[in-house]
């Protein structure tokens, strides 16, 4: 197929060039009705912010340019079908899981999953079996699930309705999935992979393999995370014979907006085009990787920080992700480092107790040199600050192989109450506790609360982490059943 084509974007552009007069929604009327002080920022994009006009197709019943754009994406990724998502990978996870899982179905789930996976399991009233990721204490980060642990769970629960994996994790760390997928398929179990951070993996080595290349049945990717797509723009890929496509499409129609953003969908068309052009230029990919490697090397040479990576041979890192760790005696935590970098207008993806995570661009046209100078300046200033917090107090993340203490169905029938932290140990959590980003719950709804949970939550609060948990959590309280 001709991957240089951009059917949806081209059609939108042609519509704009005809200088149309809008008597349809949205109410800004191609940008004519808009607050004057904001117009300069929004005017260009509002010109193509239209609705399902003749020739512009319909996301929920595509037959024209949207269908063509999705077909080009499917061709690029080598899958049966690709769907454009306008509600992020969240809706991809929800629709994928609901399409294969029903009430009381057993589902094998990687524990360090996004909250949207857990919301889908709750909506389905499923029975999740959680597999804990391994933890690398040398760099203080989870490195994915052990293949043998997942295969053991499949053999223990051969009638499971799905295996749900997260690969890569938020830090860009991946593991080989083919062994898991092959065993799951031998048991007629579909595999769903949340590959939100890996839309670019089909570029090939040195990037990790994409789950679409290892046979996963449903693969969800946030195009907006690493490709040049607008926020919330994502892809859902389908392949194999285990998926009921009619059921999947029902949930996509039910869960996504009936008024999808045309600029957002056009950006997915353009992101696919960008990736296809890059994939066809191996020399350009090599040059890009060399630039990223050089940036990391120079970053690692800045006093006060170091670039860290897992050393195990069985994991592979995404070249677009960089974990930096504070090493100066006056820089105690990742949160402290993140705040200081922001003083020089360097904005990172996330901080945790140990690291700051940077997401690098899929382009050499980026102010790498200017960024290095700003980071150096921020580090010079932070070296003269003081903090009394001892990072060694932080215990490892409290993941473990587990099932829920009570089922989702039972939760609907039980009353919630709020108790102080000290009274919560041994009780069942009635609300999740979620550091955000990355959106991975420390404590699951329905999980038995332990002292390790509370210690970790308390440490994060002391460090000033952003945690989704409601007002009760701010008052050192938890909701329990």
What are these regions (language model features)?
Residues 46-89:
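Conserved N-terminal alpha-helix of the aminotransferase class I/II PLP-enzyme fold
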Residues 282-359, 383-403:
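Conserved small-domain helix->loop->beta segment predominantly found in fold-type I
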Residues 1-64:
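N-terminal "arm"/small-domain region of PLP-dependent enzymes with the aminotransferase-like
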Residues 349-481:
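PLP-dependent enzyme catalytic core of the Aspartate aminotransferase-like
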Residues 212-250, 256-267:
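Active-site PLP attachment segment
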Residues 139-200:
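Active-site phosphate-binding strand-loop segment of PLP-dependent enzymes
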Residues 101-117:
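Conserved PLP-anchoring active-site segment centered on the Schiff-base-forming lysine
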Residues 81-104, 120:
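Conserved beta-loop-alpha segment that forms the PLP phosphate-binding cup at the N-terminus of a helix
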């Amino acid at each position: 197929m001709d991957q240089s084509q951009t059917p949806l974007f081209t059609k939108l552009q042609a519509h704009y060039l005809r200088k149309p007069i809008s008597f349809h929604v949205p109410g800004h009327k191609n940008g004519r009705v808009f607050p004057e002080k904001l117009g300069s920022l929004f005017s260009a994009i509002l010109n193509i912010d239209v609705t399902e006009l003749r020739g512009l197709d319909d996301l929920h019943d595509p037959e024209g340019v949207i269908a063509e754009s999705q077909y080009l994406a499917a061709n690029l990724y080598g899958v049966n079908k690709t769907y454009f998502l306008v509600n992020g990978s969240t809706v991809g996870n929800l629709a994928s899981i609901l399409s294969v899982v029903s009430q009381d179905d057993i589902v094998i789930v990687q524990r360090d999953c996004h909250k949207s996976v857990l919301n889908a399991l709750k909506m389905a009233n499923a029975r999740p079996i959680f597999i804990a990721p391994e933890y690398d204490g040398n760099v203080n980060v989870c490195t994915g699930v052990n293949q043998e642990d997942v295969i053991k769970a499949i053999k223990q629960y051969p009638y499971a309705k799905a295996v749900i994996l997260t690969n890569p994790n938020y830090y860009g760390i991946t593991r080989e999935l083919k062994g898991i997928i092959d065993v799951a398929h031998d048991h007629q179990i579909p595999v769903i992979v949340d590959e939100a951070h890996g839309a670019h993996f089909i570029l090939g080595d040195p990037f990790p393999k994409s789950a679409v290349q290892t046979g996963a049945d449903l693969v969800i990717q946030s195009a907006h995370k690493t490709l040049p797509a607008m926020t919330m723009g994502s892809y859902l890929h389908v392949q194999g014979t285990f998926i009921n496509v009619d059921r999947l499409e029902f949930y996509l129609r039910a869960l996504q907006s009936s008024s999808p953003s045309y600029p957002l969908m056009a950006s997915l068309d353009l992101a696919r085009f960008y990736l296809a052009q890059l994939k066809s230029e191996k020399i350009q990919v090599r040059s890009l990787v060399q630039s990223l490697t050089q940036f990391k090397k120079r970053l690692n040479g800045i006093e006060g920080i170091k670039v860290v990576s897992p050393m195990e041979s069985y994991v592979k890192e995404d070249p677009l992700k960089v974990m930096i760790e504070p090493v100066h005696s006056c820089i105690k935590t990742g949160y402290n480092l993140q705040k200081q970098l922001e003083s020089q207008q360097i904005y990172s993806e996330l901080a945790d107790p140990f690291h700051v995570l940077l997401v690098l661009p899929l382009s050499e046209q980026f102010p790498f040199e200017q960024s290095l100078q700003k980071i150096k300046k921020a580090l010079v200033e932070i070296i003269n600050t003081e903090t009394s917090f001892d990072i060694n107090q932080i215990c490892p993340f409290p993941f473990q192989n587990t099932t829920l203490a009570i089922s989702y169905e039972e939760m609907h029938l039980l009353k919630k109450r709020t108790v102080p932290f000290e009274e919560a140990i041994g009780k069942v959590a009635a609300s999740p506790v979620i550091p955000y980003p990355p959106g991975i719950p420390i404590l699951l709804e329905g999980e038995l609360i332990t002292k390790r949970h509370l210690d970790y939550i308390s440490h994060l609060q002391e460090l000033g982490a952003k945690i989704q948990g409601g007002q009760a959590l701010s008052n050192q309280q938890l909701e329990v059943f």
